[in-house]
Amino acid sequence: IIKLYEDNGFKLYNRITIWKEPLRVRTRTMVQSLMHKFIVEDSTKCFTAMPDYVLIFKRNGDNEVPVTHNSGLTKYYGDTPILPAMVGIFNRANETNFDAVQLWDYLKNTYADHKDTKSNKLSHYIWQRYASSVWDDIRIDNVLPFRDSKEEDDEKHVHPLQLDVIDRLVDLYSNPNEVVLTPFMGVGSEVYS
């Protein structure tokens, strides 16, 4: 994929790894290499849960229409907006005693309509999560409905993209009301989002 894009004038700009929880992957896909019984019987049959990757390409040159976030990032798409380390840092800096839920509620209530991007702590905390090279906060079940593989002969390649990934990328890389190209339809997640 990377070579194909590079051969057509694009440069790989970023790669994001989307972590997958092994038990949920096993349950959804029925892949045998994630079964615990093979650790006992023959661990050479075992493999890790494969992550998803988002590859971001850009062409050289100036972007004629900058993607702007005039108030910073205001919506978080994912499961865990505040990491434990973030809570401790915030509490020490502000002499508070919030837990993760209280801190997130405080940030949303205090900064949701905040216009100064430099002091908008909500935007800064969202960006800390998004700026990670591994997105471990994507809700694996936040997908459009599809039929799970249950029988041995079922198709095992149905992997709808999580809506958090789509929403996050559209928010990061497009302006409001822009038309976004989706090169494949799949189960329709991009169009739905």
At which residue positions do the language-model features occur?
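Core catalytic lobe of class I
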Residues: 1-193
